[in-house]
Amino acid sequence: MEEFDKEQAIADIAEKLNIQKDKILYIEYSDLFQINDCVIPAVIADNIKVFQEYNLYFYRCTIPNLILEITIKSLEFKMCCFESSFIIRNNFDGYISIQDSIFEKDFGIFWVKKEVYKINVCKNIFKDVSIFENKILNFNF
């Protein structure tokens, strides 16, 4: 089995999210990468695969527009600001947690086809929320 190279993973995440490597920490005991205090530019389709490859935890980040319709490992957001749309839809699958964050525009979960086992969205400030036609087994809002 190939040994995990955390430095290469940090470089890969930094490149795909277009952020500085020093903003990323690897938390070994939980096998996640914590991304701190940065602005995430728009995530283009080719680079969204970063969410499939790594467990990511965003802390105090600004995120412009994020549409998730793929299978992810796990995503956590705490004290983040979503400047535009945050949408979960269609073929989304995985674990997601969003806490103590601000959504300046749209937040939506629609047409999720697979049974999603955990979506945790709590203690946030929303402007516009739409949730309909989903298969979510454990949803905390």
Stretches with model-predicted labels:
Residues 55-57:
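Parallel beta-helix/beta-solenoid
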Residues 6, 97-103:
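Conserved long hydrophobic alpha-helices within structured protein cores
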Residues 15-28, 37, 41-51, 64-71, ...:
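Short, T/G/N/S-enriched strand-turn elements that build extracellular solenoid repeat scaffolds
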Residues 6-10, 19-21:
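Short amphipathic alpha-helical segments that mediate assembly, nucleic-acid/protein binding
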